């Protein structure tokens, strides 16, 4: 039974506060779960060094191999897998290049579609947009 008197505001607020803990988004935000377990530590993007170029198998019902790079993050040394979007994008990226990675925009920060275990995608290579390098609009910077 919920109080409904003229001065019941404080009690109503207290009850609402209690029920907020049933919302998983509220719980994740309050307990700062993303910052604790995310390799990017809650940041939208991070830079790192390419360790190796590899590929992963697509998930069913699709088939094929997706080109990815293993990146060691500068901020904490963790190694993550990043997707290289676009046709021929893997040819532009070399080992020991500095890349900027962003989230791949999957549900709740997870992997997207048929790409298993890959949560990030490459955005910049040595400070230049991967899309423009791929299309040949700009040349790759010498390091």
Curated annotation (Swiss-Prot):
A GO-annotated cellular component: small ribosomal subunit
Q: Does the entry feature the keyword RNA-binding, yes or no?
A: yes
**Any one Gene Ontology biological process term?**
translation
Q: List the InterPro entries.
A: NA-bd_OB-fold, Ribosomal_uS12, Ribosomal_uS12_arc, Ribosomal_uS12_euk/arc
Gene Ontology MF terms in the entry: rRNA binding; structural constituent of ribosome
Tell me any Pfam family this protein matches.
Ribosom_S12_S23
Its keywords, alphabetically, are: Ribonucleoprotein, Ribosomal protein, RNA-binding, rRNA-binding
**Could you describe the subunit structure of this protein?**
Part of the 30S ribosomal subunit.
Task: Give the protein's biological function.
Answer: With S4 and S5 plays an important role in translational accuracy. Located at the interface of the 30S and 50S subunits.
Entry's family note: Belongs to the universal ribosomal protein uS12 family.
The identity of this protein, by name, is Small ribosomal subunit protein uS12
Q: List the lineage, top down.
A: Archaea, Nanobdellota, Candidatus Nanoarchaeia, Nanoarchaeales, Nanoarchaeaceae
């Amino acid at each position: 039974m919920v109080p409904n008197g003229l001065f019941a505001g404080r009690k109503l607020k207290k009850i609402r506060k209690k029920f907020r803990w049933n919302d998983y988004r509220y719980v994740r935000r309050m307990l700062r779960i993303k910052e604790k377990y995310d390799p990017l530590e809650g940041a939208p993007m991070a830079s790192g060094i390419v360790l190796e170029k590899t590929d992963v198998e697509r998930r069913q019902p699709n088939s094929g191999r997706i080109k990815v790079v293993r990146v060691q993050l500068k901020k904490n040394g963790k190694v993550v897998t990043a997707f290289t979007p676009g046709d021929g994008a893997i040819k532009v990226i070399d080992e020991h290049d500095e890349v900027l990675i962003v989230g791949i925009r999957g549900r709740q920060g997870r992997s997207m579609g048929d790409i298993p275990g890959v949560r990030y995608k490459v955005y910049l290579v040595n400070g230049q947009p991967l899309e423009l390098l791929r299309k040949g609009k700009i040349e790759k910077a010498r390091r």
